[in-house]
Amino acid sequence: MSRQKKSRRLTDVMPTRKADKKTEIGAVKARPGKKLTRYELDARAREEKRKRKHKGLDSGSRHSASSDSGKNQQTEVKDPRIGSRKKVPLVVEFVNKPEKGQFIQPIKTEKKPTALDPATELEQLENNECLNDLLDQLDAGKVLSKEDQVFVDECLARIAQLMDELGISDDEEGEDDLLRTFEKIDINQFR
């Protein structure tokens, strides 16, 4: 038994040139209950590609559409907050300067008296690094400027005043007093 060759359908045969058969999307229809042939699928794909290729706007639409958009902009209500014509200074020269015809009342600030405890104030003055540096310079024999000398004098006067208030004496004991206390000490106390 020999095999018989299947006969081809006429729709399966592709045209030799494009000009021979122009297909439109409507022309390539699916037959009910049957699959599309390769030729019909190719024709449909070509047409869809041609559609996709021309999907965008026409060339030069940017220029031609501007006249239409200009008409639309006139009808729209503009927000007055957008596009202010008031000039904005690039460099701020005066801070809190009142505008013309306005007066800004100064805020009254009450100076709170900072009454520290005399012991704390004395401790702060003794731990003042600037004062200690200036006193070290004086001990080294250097001459201070007028402002530095005034600062040192004021601080030392305040320290003396606070020591009087607290009852602290700055009297240094003489060598004779030290010898007397040394002689009076009983050595047996420390054993």
Swiss-Prot record:
Q: Does the keyword NAD apply?
A: no
List the biased-composition ranges (Basic and acidic residues). 9-24, 37-48
Question: A Gene Ontology molecular-function term?
Answer: GTPase activator activity
Alphabetical UniProt keywords: GTPase activation, Ribosome biogenesis
Annotated Pfam families = YihI (PF04220)
Region entry Disordered: which residue ranges?
1-84
- For this entry, list what GO says about its biological process: ribosome biogenesis
Member of which family?
Answer: Belongs to the YihI family.
Read off the HAMAP family from this record: GAP_YihI
The subunit structure is: Interacts with Der.
What is this protein's function? Answer: A GTPase-activating protein (GAP) that modifies Der/EngA GTPase function. May play a role in ribosome biogenesis.
The protein's name in its UniProt record: Der GTPase-activating protein YihI
